[in-house]
Swiss-Prot record:
tRNA-binding keyword on record: no
Family (UniProt): Belongs to the universal ribosomal protein uL6 family.
GO MF: rRNA binding; structural constituent of ribosome
UniProt protein name: Large ribosomal subunit protein uL6
InterPro entries found in the cross-reference section: Ribosomal_uL6-like, Ribosomal_uL6-like_a/b-dom_sf, Ribosomal_uL6_a/b-dom, Ribosomal_uL6_bac-type, Ribosomal_uL6_CS
General function of this protein: This protein binds to the 23S rRNA, and is important in its secondary structure. It is located near the subunit interface in the base of the L7/L12 stalk, and near the tRNA binding site of the peptidyltransferase center.
GO biological process, alphabetically ordered: cytoplasmic translation
Recorded GO CC terms: cytosolic large ribosomal subunit
Length: 178
């Protein structure tokens, strides 16, 4: 069984946590994140260490305990280092470009798909077939990357589509003729 909730979170230099009635604000060099946590979970800040405690050992409290600790750690990492999801496009004529804060995708449709960057998330297009989704909130970076991928997810026959860098796409054999 996982014991993630019992691990202590160590704050890097330049990161500050303010806990007021389980509404936690984390400030760091990359920005600020605020999130409300369950009232039953105790969050204590002592110097550069943050501990998360639970009132009892019920199954519900154990799950909330681990999730709270993981979310809090993601906030600390986000404001100090940030998060990045890299996507790659494979297919003839598939390309991406930036227009202001919008991501414009040509993925084999009769029209171009436009994706507006949500608040706190930015797009980077180092090459026409590579997209980086960058931000301080892990949840919104992951959701935005998943949405971009869903516009043309990789198909199993030729492998065309948008995929995460390093993602394995299982290939199928096509029909055989008579």
């Amino acid at each position: 069984m996982s014991r993630i909730g019992n691990k202590v979170i160590t704050l890097p230099a330049g990161v500050e946590i303010i806990n007021k009635d389980n509404v936690v604000t984390v400030k760091g060099p990359k920005g600020q994140l605020t999130r409300e946590f369950n009232k039953n979970i105790g969050i204590t800040v002592e110097g550069t260490e943050v501990t998360v405690t639970r009132p009892n050992d019920s199954k519900e409290m154990k799950t909330i305990h681990g999730t709270t600790r993981a979310n809090l750690n993601n906030m600390v990492v986000g404001v100090s280092e940030g998060f990045k999801k890299a996507l790659e496009m494979r297919g003839v004529g598939y390309r991406a470009q930036l227009q202001g804060s919008k991501l414009v995708l040509s993925v084999g449709k009769s029209h171009q798909d436009e994706v507006e960057a949500p608040e706190g998330v930015t797009f980077e297009v180092p090459t026409p077939t590579t997209i980086n989704v960058i931000g301080i909130n892990k949840e919104s970076v992951g959701q935005t990357a998943a949405y971009v991928r869903s516009l043309r997810s990789p198909e199993p026959y030729k492998g065309k589509g948008i995929r995460y860098v390093g993602e394995f796409v299982r290939r199928k054999e096509g029909k055989t003729g008579k």
